[in-house]
Amino acid sequence: MQKIKEYIKKLEEGCDLSSEEAEAALEEVLSTAEDGEIETFLLALKAKGEKPQEIVGFVRGMKKAGNMIKPNTPFRIVDTCGTGGDGLNTINVSTAAAIVTAAAGVPVAKHGNRAATSMTGSSDVLEALGIKVDLSPEYVRKTIEKIGIGFMFAPVFHPAMKRVAGVRKKLGVRTVFNILGPLTNPAGAKGQVVGVFDKNLCEPIAYALAELGTEHALVVHGDGMDEITNTGETYVAELKNGKVSTYTLTPESLGMLRASPGDTKGGSPKENARDLLCIFKGQKGPKRDLIILNAAAALYVSGIVGSIRQAIPIAEDAIDSGKVMVKFNQFRTFTGEFYQIDKKQGFIPGKTALSPSRVSMLSPASGEQA
């Protein structure tokens, strides 16, 4: 029996949904609800404001409908992912930071998609760099296990999202789906740096991550940016040891130079790819500093250091020693090889249904360690 109308009425009356109700509502939205009902539901929720328990329910519903993987790694897996939607068109900070983090020895399961409001999304710049982004889930798992980094293309891992694409486009406003991406990491990353487009989302998302089992997370909003910024103050809600604390960071407090907003602007996928390659090869400047700050945050939530500041020299060394270029080349080579295998097996991103034999590979196979 459909309950979406009941949930809409409750939201319109200003009442919060329980996590169970939110999960059930999300399941209807992704399956049987009509477009008009989806539209009304999303707008009513937006008008009321999303609460942590509602976000938790939506995330659980998304994961239930998605393709999850369980990579076997020696250390805590981390993700660097932003909501996007800040409208600032900076370079691809979280994507570059993910590669730097992996080069420093921390396994990364990067969740991402194409550009929503900026010129260049994470998958756009990776493709411009020659990295195959639309691998099947089991080959993403293998990439993470073999080289310590994998990219999880949202349409492959969350195919049910196609169901709401038309409504979201028609609405043309931010909805709860804009904040679910960073929270629905298909590899179950336990360390996360989550950038958000609105400072007021930092604490609700941190509390939601606590409920979802994340071990250490930084939910950040920096000077209008969904990253830790080097152009001004960054507001942080940190989840650690089950508790959430809030504070403000500045570039100076982390030993970095302050930059001007124009110094970190991005461009087209090709332009951003060129910038990232120059940085990976050692070019210094504000864009490199921005990437280092966010990679240091990822290293911090991985548990290998006790603070972001302690991690900055590690991130710098990963670039200066050449480790980042080695990791980048591995990433490009492995994804290219696995893409060809996928192609031979008939995998079509977003279209090919996973057979039972392929689904069984989404977690370590028999004989492998869990």
From Swiss-Prot:
Entry binding sites for 5-phospho-alpha-D-ribose 1-diphosphate: 82, 85-86, 90, 92-95, 110-118, 122
Positions annotated to bind Mg(2+) 2: D226, E227
Entry keywords, A to Z: Amino-acid biosynthesis, Aromatic amino acid biosynthesis, Glycosyltransferase, Magnesium, Metal-binding, Transferase, Tryptophan biosynthesis
Swiss-Prot/TrEMBL catalytic activity: N-(5-phospho-beta-D-ribosyl)anthranilate + diphosphate = 5-phospho-alpha-D-ribose 1-diphosphate + anthranilate
InterPro entries assigned to the protein according to its UniProt record, in alphabetical order: Anthranilate_Pribosyl_Tfrase, Glycosyl_Trfase_fam3, Glycosyl_Trfase_fam3_N_dom, Glycosyl_Trfase_fam3_N_dom_sf, Nuc_phospho_transferase
Cofactors demanded by this protein: Mg(2+)
Residues annotated to bind anthranilate 1: G82, N113
Subunit details: Homodimer.
Alphabetical list of HAMAP family matching this protein: TrpD
Name by which UniProt lists this protein: Anthranilate phosphoribosyltransferase
This protein's encoding gene: trpD
